[in-house]
Every structure is written in C-alpha cells, then in structure tokens.
Amino acid sequence: MSVLRSTCLFFPPRSLLISFNKRRLFSTSRLILNKESETTKKKDKSKQQDFNPRHLGVAAEIFIPSAYKNLPNVFAHPLIVANALIRRLYTFGLNSVQVALFRFQSGIKPSFLLWKNKAIETYINVNTSFAHKNLSDIKGLVSLWVQEALEARSRQLPGNATLDWQLIKFNAVPKLVSVQPIMIPGMPLEHLQLVYKFDTKQRLIKVNQQTKKTETLDRDVVDYIAFLCDATTNDMILMGSLFESKPNDKLPKSYEDDAKVAIHRMKVNGDIYRLPPS
C-alpha cells in the first residue's frame, strides 16, 4: 500500500497536465511568432537598405498644362481652349488632392519652399557640372537614367574647348506644376515626384583652347524638371525632364502597367538636353 501511494505521487492530475500542455503550447507559439516577427523585420530592413532611389525615373506620362501664350486663338478654336482650361483646373485640383492625401497618410508636413530652393540648387549644380565635365560631382544628385544620358552627351562635347554655364536670371518665379506621391514596396510613404517649371535666361560660354576664341550665347530656356523628393530628409534627386503638353492633348493615365514602356520612358526622359518632340 505504501508503494502504491508513493507511486501515485509521480502522476499529476489530468487537469494539471492539460494546463501544463496549454502553457507550453502557448509559450512555444509565442516564441515562434516572435522569431517570425524578427525575421520579417530583418527582411523589411534589408529591403529598405537595398532600395536605391537613384534607380527611379519618370516612368509615367505627366500632363503639363499648356502656357496661356501657347493656346490658340479663342475665337478660332473655342473648344480646344475650353478643354485646355478645364484640364488645367483639373490638374490643379488633382495636385491639391495628392498633397492632402500624402500629408494624411504619411503624417509629414510638406516643406514646399525648402524643396523648391533645393530643386533650384540641384538644377544649377547639374548644368554647371555638365558644362565643366565634372559629372562625378553630381552623381548623388541625379538618377541613374540622367547620369547615363549626361555621360553619353559629355562624350560628344568638343575636346579642344572649355565650356561654362551661367544662370543669369529667372524670367518667372519657379512653379510647381505636378505633385505625385511615390509608393515604394516594403517602405512607408515618404517620397514625392515633383515637377517644376524653370523659365530662365541662360548663358553658355565656349572657349577654344587652340585659338583662344570665346563665343557667348544667351538664350531663354523653359525647362520642366522632375525631382524625387524624400520628405523625411528633404533630399532631392533629379529624375529627368518633361515637355509641355499640347493644347489638344488629353489627360494620360496616372501609371504605366507595361514594364517595357516604363523603362523606355525613363530612359528617354532621363536625357534632359534632348529636343522637344516635333
């Protein structure tokens, strides 16, 4: 009897076993979930570290409203002018909505004045460095698509001449014409695509090293330059350039679902010194 009693002491009640198994199962599940959570965080962190914003270019068509001076005569083409004005108002409203959505979803207050000043600074640095053939100085300021195009054009510059580029003045206040939030997979909403209109008077000075002859060319230039803006760091990367839409152009779709078309468009828009389409 004493042996049986002592033996029974080694067997806990059934309810205690069930309780113990539940606790063990719960702790094991929690450990697995914690490990999975840590693995997911590490993967997300590695994705963020692998992301390079310089890989992004202008992939989608962007509607740039025609300047008032480029609209046809309202009496000769009233419908075209009316549609152009409607699209201009629609674009203005869409930009306002995009800004509001970005601010709501990201919780970041846009710093438009700072971004405009940094865009101007980047624009000047890129043009100056290209004229001086110092593309290494602006490597972090431009996308890979722009860098590739600048390197190709730099090889076409005359070897026996030195160039200097100067921004004489702005003919009009730089204007933000397009705002589009950029969603990057695996990352919070932090980036914007901003397109600025720069109406400038520029000077290009060319000096022939053999004859020492100097040529000076002054001209008015209107550029529509796209930038990738990191709203958390205020860093600006020049993504490419665009051209003003024609008065009878329709609104394009806001995204490009064909990868080949998107890549081709990023390459074309990366050449900021290309001529406008005829």
From Swiss-Prot:
A Pfam family hit: MBA1
Gene disruption phenotype: Leads to a reduced growth rate on non-fermentable carbon sources, which is more pronounced at high temperature. Shows defects in the membrane insertion of nascent chains resulting in the accumulation of the precursor form of subunit 2 of cytochrome oxidase.
Single GO BP term: positive regulation of mitochondrial translation
GO cellular component: mitochondrial inner membrane; mitochondrion
Gene3D superfamilies listed in its UniProt record: 3.10.450.240
Transit peptide: 1-33
Swiss-Prot/TrEMBL keywords: Membrane, Mitochondrion, Mitochondrion inner membrane, Transit peptide
Source organism, top-level taxon: Eukaryota
Membrane topology of this protein: Peripheral membrane protein
Entries under InterPro entries matching the protein: Mba1 (IPR024621), Mba1_Saccharomycetales (IPR012483)
Listed GO MF terms: mitochondrial ribosome binding; ribosome binding
Compartment(s) of residence: Mitochondrion inner membrane
Role according to the record: Mitochondrial inner membrane-associated mitoribosome receptor that spatially aligns the mitoribosome exit tunnel with the membrane insertion machinery and allows cotranslational protein membrane insertion.
More details: Present with 2720 molecules/cell in log phase SD medium.
Assembly behavior: Interacts with OXA1 and MDM38. Binds to mitoribosomes in order to recruit them to the mitochondrial inner membrane.
Protein name: Inner membrane mitoribosome receptor MBA1, mitochondrial
